[in-house]
C-alpha cells in the first residue's frame, strides 16, 4: 500500500500492533498528539494489550509498553470502545475470510462502523480492510512520514524515534526509513 505523506486521517482505531508501535517512541507519540491525532481501541484490543494471559513472562519492553498504554488511558487517550452485535457479526464475516486475531478484526469492523481510519501495521489486516471496501487504512510509518512532512517532526527527530522504537523491540525501523525518504520527496515535490 503506497502512502501519501501529505495526508493523514486524524482519528484512528488502532489494533494491538499499532498501539505498541505508536507508544514505542515517546517522541513520535508526543508529535502525534501535538498534531491533534487521536487514537482509540476496541475492548478486544484493550484485552489483548493489557489482560490477555501470555505464554511467557512479559519482557521489560512489553511491561513498559503496557505501562504507557495504561497511563495514556488514565489521561483519556486510547479509549476502549465495546463492539455491539452488529459489529460482532461483521467480525464473524471478516474472520471467515482471513486468519487474523480478534483485535485486528474488531478494529477494522469498528473503524468501518464509525467511518474513521484503522491504523494497523499488519499486512493481512490492511489487505482485509481494503478488500472490505474501507478507504481509510493507515500505518505507523505513514503517521511518521506525515509528521515529518508537516514539520511536527524534524530531521533530528528521526534517529530519536528510531532508537526509541528499537529499544522497545519493535520491528518497523526499516519502514520508518522508507517513510522518511517518502516525506522528504513529497516535501521537495510540493515546493
Question: Which role fits each region the language model picked out?
Answer:
Residues 2-110, 114-116, 123-132, 137-138, ...:
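Active-site-proximal, substrate-binding regions of enzyme catalytic domains
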Amino acid at each position: 500500500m503506497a502512502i501519501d505523506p501529505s495526508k493523514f486521517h486524524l482519528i484512528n482505531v488502532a489494533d494491538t500492533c499499532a498501539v505498541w508501535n505508536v507508544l514505542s517512541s515517546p517522541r513520535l507519540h508526543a508529535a502525534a498528539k501535538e498534531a491533534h491525532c487521536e487514537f482509540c481501541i476496541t475492548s478486544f484490543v484493550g484485552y489483548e494489550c493489557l489482560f490477555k494471559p501470555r505464554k511467557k513472562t512479559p519482557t521489560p519492553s512489553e511491561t513498559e509498553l503496557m505501562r504507557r498504554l495504561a497511563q495514556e488511558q488514565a489521561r483519556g487517550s486510547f479509549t476502549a470502545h465495546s463492539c455491539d452485535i452488529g459489529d460482532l457479526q461483521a467480525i464473524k464475516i471478516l474472520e471467515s475470510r482471513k486468519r487474523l486475531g480478534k483485535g485486528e478484526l474488531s478494529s477494522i469492523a469498528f473503524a468501518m462502523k464509525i467511518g474513521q481510519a484503522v491504523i494497523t501495521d499488519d499486512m493481512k489486516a490492511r489487505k482485509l480492510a481494503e478488500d472490505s471496501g474501507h478507504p481509510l487504512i493507515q500505518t505507523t510509518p505513514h503517521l511518521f512520514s506525515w509528521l515529518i512532512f508537516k514539520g511536527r517532526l524534524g530531521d533530528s527527530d528521526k534517529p530519536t524515534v528510531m532508537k526509541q522504537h528499537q529499544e522497545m523491540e519493535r520491528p518497523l525501523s526499516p519502514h520508518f526509513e522508507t517513510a522518511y525518504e517518502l516525506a522528504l520527496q513529497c516535501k521537495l515535490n510540493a515546493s
